[in-house]
């Protein structure tokens, strides 16, 4: 019966998770249309590939649709969703459509609170170098491919598994990765951390009896749930009990150099073209999967050495010219952009920057993402943001939420001043952030723009300044 479905419409097609699935379906021969509130690189790419993309949501957009795909960001009162219900057009959640794609291949699903996008990209890159030509769907732009999705000819599909709405429980992969488990998106789990842990355990139960769970043993919560997992397990990380273990990791010129030990294999010397100890862990997950699937170590080493990263994951813009202004001399500053929006991610990025740019002053421009996250992790944000040398703090990016008292940017800035380790410069409007940064920085600084909201447009303006 599925041959009757030819036209698939995406509500919110420009989203990172939606656009990748849309691209794979285009390459499978489906007619794809979609709508979004604005244009971005993803929508422009899909148009070039043959999709019909409309700006704005309207009932007439779905006139020819045999099915529509929605993400959790799409509300029930969306006019296209209402029209689909009235016409009895199937409404398919994004994760269910991803699960359908996974049924066409052997799935490799990457889960965890942090590191999903980079780990998925590393796995896809390693398998591609090993000749397996995987299909992949990633939540960010894989720089080497120039896309966040690709239809491969091989038997595997590599995809992120999203725990934010528990939709990863729709997937049925043969290999799973759990990078870590932290308190985030707790509204999905009734603000009960035990329910979040149980969801990850249930995720591993989606594996077939011959499947394998690849787990980061460095993470305390992952270690805690391991006895409750009834599938084959391969562990990785720095921990002395890790089956795929990284040792002697050090940062040299923005690369991570380390050795990987695993029983039955010769020690592997790795030079990873990404900074940060967290990326060493992510690379170990890719190494574990590569060996599970028979990829030669030399191919894995080559892929990791040549890995160009993912869009907005410690994206390095290089040294940017800093013009002379008044009594401030001309010079240069290094610019890095990152999607991180959780205290753990922020800490990892700061640590990576310290390793990649030793001895240089670190200026962090941070935009909190969601009032609920700011409220739930307020003290953690104060602790982590206090570790930078200078902080430019934006107002919270709401992401559709209503403001919460004492969970806004000004309150966070005040708490940071009271803590006494950093004196943040608060910026109410993100449009004012580039000028604020340029006024603060000096020759030799390292600037990190960070957050999952509208701060993504700031780096381009800094480059043009």
From Swiss-Prot:
Natural source organism: Janthinobacterium sp. (strain Marseille)
A molecular function GO annotation: ATP binding
Catalytic reaction equation(s): UDP-N-acetyl-alpha-D-muramate + L-alanine + ATP = UDP-N-acetyl-alpha-D-muramoyl-L-alanine + ADP + phosphate + H(+)
Domain of life: Bacteria
Compartments, as annotated in UniProt: Cytoplasm
Listed name of the protein: UDP-N-acetylmuramate--L-alanine ligase
Keyword Endoplasmic reticulum: no
Any one Gene Ontology BP term: peptidoglycan biosynthetic process
Binding annotation for ATP: 112-118
The protein's annotated pathway: Cell wall biogenesis; peptidoglycan biosynthesis
Family affiliation: Belongs to the MurCDEF family.
InterPro entries, A to Z: Mur-like_cat_sf, Mur_ligase_C, Mur_ligase_C_dom_sf, Mur_ligase_cen, Mur_ligase_N, MurCDEF_pg_biosynth, UDP-N-AcMur_Ala_ligase_MurC
Record's GO cellular component terms: cytoplasm
Top-tier EC class: ligase
Keywords: ATP-binding, Cell cycle, Cell division, Cell shape, Cell wall biogenesis/degradation, Cytoplasm, Ligase, Nucleotide-binding, Peptidoglycan synthesis
EC numbers: 6.3.2.8
Function of the protein: Cell wall formation.
């Amino acid at each position: 019966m599925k041959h009757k479905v030819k036209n698939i419409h995406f509500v919110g097609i420009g989203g990172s998770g939606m656009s990748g699935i849309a691209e794979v379906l285009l390459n499978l021969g489906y007619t794809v249309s979609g709508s979004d509130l604005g244009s971005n690189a993803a929508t422009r790419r899909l148009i070039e590939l043959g999709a019909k993309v409309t700006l704005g949501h309207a009932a007439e957009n779905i006139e020819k649709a045999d099915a529509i795909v929605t993400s959790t960001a799409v509300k029930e009162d969306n006019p296209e969703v209402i029209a689909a219900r009235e016409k009895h057009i199937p409404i398919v959640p994004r994760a269910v459509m991803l699960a359908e794609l996974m049924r066409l291949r052997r799935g490799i699903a990457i889960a965890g609170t942090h590191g999903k996008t980079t780990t998925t990209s590393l796995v896809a890159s390693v398998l591609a170098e090993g000749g397996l030509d995987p299909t992949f769907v990633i939540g960010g732009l894989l720089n080497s491919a120039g896309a966040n999705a690709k239809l491969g000819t091989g038997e595997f599909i590599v995809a992120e598994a999203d725990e934010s709405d528990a939709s990863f429980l729709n997937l049925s992969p043969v290999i799973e990765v759990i990078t870590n488990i932290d308190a985030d998106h707790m509204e999905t789990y009734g603000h009960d951390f035990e329910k979040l842990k149980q969801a990850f355990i249930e995720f591993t139960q989606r594996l077939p009896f011959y499947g394998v769970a690849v787990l980061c043993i460095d993470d305390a919560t992952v270690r805690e749930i391991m006895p409750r997992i009834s599938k084959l397990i391969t562990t990785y990380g720095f921990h002395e009990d890790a089956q795929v273990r990284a040792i002697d990791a050090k940062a040299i010129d923005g690369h991570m150099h380390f050795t990987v030990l695993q029983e039955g294999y010769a020690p592997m010397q790795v030079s990873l073209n990404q900074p940060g100890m967290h990326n060493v862990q992510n690379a170990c997950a890719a190494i574990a999967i590569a060996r599970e699937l028979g990829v030669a170590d030399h191919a894995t080493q080559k892929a990791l050495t040549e890995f160009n990263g993912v869009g907005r994951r410690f994206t390095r813009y290089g040294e940017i010219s800093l013009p002379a202004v008044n009594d401030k001399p001309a010079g240069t500053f290094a610019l890095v952009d990152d999607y991180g929006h959780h205290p753990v991610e922020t800490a990892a990025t700061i640590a990576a920057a310290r390793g990649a740019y030793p001895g240089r002053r670190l200026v962090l421009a941070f935009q909190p993402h969601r009032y609920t996250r700011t409220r739930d992790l307020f003290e953690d944000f104060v602790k982590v943001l206090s570790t930078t040398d200078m902080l430019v703090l934006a107002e919270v990016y709401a992401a559709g939420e209503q403001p919460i008292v004492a969970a806004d940017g000004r309150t966070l800035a005040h708490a940071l001043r009271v803590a006494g380790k950093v004196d943040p410069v608060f910026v109410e409007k993100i449009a004012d952030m580039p000028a604020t940064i340029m006024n603060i920085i000096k020759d030799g600084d390292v600037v990190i723009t960070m957050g999952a909201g509208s701060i993504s447009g700031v780096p381009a303006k800094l480059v043009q300044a």
